[in-house]
Amino acid sequence: MRNILIKTAVAGFLCLGLASCADDLNISSIDPQSSPSYDADGLLAKQYATLGLTGQAGPAGKGDMSQDEGESGFYRVIFNLQELCTDEVIWAWQTDTDIPAITNIAWNSSSVRANWAYQRLAYDITLHNQFISEQTGKMSDDVIAEVRFLRCLNYYYFLDLFHKAPFKDTFDSELPVEKTGKDLYDWIDKELTAIEPQLKEVGAYNDEKGFGRADRGAAYALHARLALNSAVYTDGQVKDYKKAKDYCDKILSSGAYALSTEAKNGFTGYEQVFMGDNDQNTQAMKEIIFPIRQDGKKTQEYSGSTYLVASMRISGMPNSFTSNYWSCNFARKDLVEKFFPKDNIPMAGENDALKDATEEQVIAKDEELKVTTKDVINKAGDDRAMFYMGVGGGIRTLSPGKQSTGFTNGASIVKWQNRHADGSDIHDGIFMDTDIPLFRLAEIYLTRAEANYRLGNTTDALADIQTIQKRANRKEISGAVDEQTLIDEWCREFYVEGRRRSDLIRFGLFSGSKYLWDFKGGVAGGIGIESKFNVYPIPVTDIAGNPNMTQNPNY
């Protein structure tokens, strides 16, 4: 962490109530041994910009770090390590850097992608430490608490991904120390407890002016997520399920948030949460507790929602509302089967292929064949089945066989959209407007359901699951709640939202052979894997540069 070059120039950003801070400040790089002059409000904007931007010059150039700027953004590094190794998605371009190792769960201590995540988190924390150190006593306690929350968030992902962190809560030239497992869990727990009373009240920033800033609701949501995973993070020493439930109760009883339930212009309540105007649509905003702000004009990057939308589309797909097609992430069969256990998803066949078709012709053909996304949703009986299996971009299959490459070897996922629910124009054709809901109310319902289940309160768990299913227009379960019910519901509600690996680990399904999926362990159909893969390795470069850090077991 000591050797990371910290650059604090603030690019144009959705300023989260900090409108005067949006200009480029052209501040020099920070040397831990010096105290350069800078605009404090601009530095606050940069704290939030670490979530949604990668540098000071738009999508590429003057990057925060020396590695591939498009690959180095906060959400993209988290998403890739949480999703590409699971039963949800496959990256089509298996010759890309480190992708086969992630797809097949065969990484080692030289993993480039694990290193990218490690360096991003370390960079962000260093920046937050600098702000907290220099602005405490100068700026209000609630603002300092916001940045302390962001620091907790980054340490949370260190704990989740690596089971340890190079830990510092000061800004100086000393090397970080290693904080592992329960010690790191306890620190995050105590730090969140300390800052929660200092933050603005629950829902204070759930409006157009403050949307994207952290209030007490964001801290409660992170605290609930931390506590739900307590047994994993502390190696079974702590099981804070009651605490997880209590923090969910605080959020739900506040009345500050609500699930997005009402259809609008043909878009379901669920769909609107992931659309390009989810920062203007009051119904979508009410569900979102803490977003990563995105805008096609003001936050141009390749690591946020631009990554989510572009990577899941191929040229020729209708209703894309972007000209940016990467043809990368497609659904594994195992994800589709959470909605279609009999593999009966509506889909076009080889004889239905069109050549050089216009978008209008593709739409007409899909409607004729009854293979539109709406047809898929209707067949699934679940608004969350946001898949495309039509003729646009090529004919898709569900079974890639022994091949994990090729974008049409699985269903296309259209959950993330640049389209605006109100019909207004998109802001840009290349970069997306869609804010990323890092915490949303549906997570609070399912967290409380799982916490209640683990506490033996199955009736209460059932009620919260039914609430989520009702919003999705899915037939509500009525029988006993079990672990399979819970893990499947987590998948249906939160697929491709950057959390699947954590959920599988919590249920004991990621490593071992209890649950197999295509290409788990590098084999079509899947094989069991070692438990060491429940955490990522510490980069060898950090161990070489910091004698305080040790490698995770068996790497």
Give the positions of each predicted feature.
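Long, intrinsically disordered, low-complexity segments
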Residues: S20-D24, S37-A40, L121-A122, W187-D189, ...
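Flexible, polar/acidic helix-loop-strand segments at domain edges
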Residues: T97-N108, V112-W116, F340-R440
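Conserved, well-structured interaction surfaces
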Residues: D41-A45, A49-T54, V89-F162, E174-D186, ...
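Membrane-proximal, proline-rich intrinsically disordered regions
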Residues: C21-Y75, G545-Y555
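Short coil/turn linking the two alpha-helices of tandem helical-hairpin repeats
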Residues: L159-L161, P166, G203, N229-G236, ...
